[in-house]
């Protein structure tokens, strides 16, 4: 399992590189990477386990964040409905956003990142809805439509695979500026 000491921090060149495509079938090393990326998220979202291991809670973790420049990320969006089901959970491999809404969305509290230790205030404008194509750990192709928070989480993780950090999207002169029609997500 990855610990906070394994998370690459802002300033490391791997976070600014274009990650390499992953080949199938997955090597044993890539299978273990996928398992470890998801395990971090599962453990970090359990308050007792999070405290026990000294983790920061996360909803996404990309391979470059653990020093591996490959197009792989885990996403575990916590349940928001009473049914207890996550709106999106998977290891996304070689993900591509194939369509996106014109409508922008942003988190009211801004975004954070396990690789960025400092608070970077400001709205991070993203597409409110996306259609995502990716492969899972078995090499099966998926195409899903996501909106609001799950869409934002996936865009954040995909940015990591292309050498972009969330604060690159923040307006440097007016970090809290936004279009009137931007959807603000709690």
From Swiss-Prot:
EC numbers for this chain: 3.5.1.88
Broad EC category: hydrolase
Keyword Ligase in record: no
Pfam families attached to this UniProt entry: Pep_deformylase
GO molecular function annotation: metal ion binding; peptide deformylase activity
Catalytic activity entry: N-terminal N-formyl-L-methionyl-[peptide] + H2O = N-terminal L-methionyl-[peptide] + formate
InterPro entries named in the record: Peptide_deformylase, Peptide_deformylase_sf
Cofactor comment text: Binds 1 Fe(2+) ion.
Names of required cofactors: Fe(2+)
GO BP, one annotated term: translation
Signal peptide extent: none
Residues of the active site: 157
UniProtKB keywords: Hydrolase, Iron, Metal-binding, Protein biosynthesis
Positions of Fe cation binding: 113, 156, 160
HAMAP family (alphabetical): Pep_deformylase
Family: Belongs to the polypeptide deformylase family.
Function statement: Removes the formyl group from the N-terminal Met of newly synthesized proteins. Requires at least a dipeptide for an efficient rate of reaction. N-terminal L-methionine is a prerequisite for activity but the enzyme has broad specificity at other positions.
Protein name: Peptide deformylase
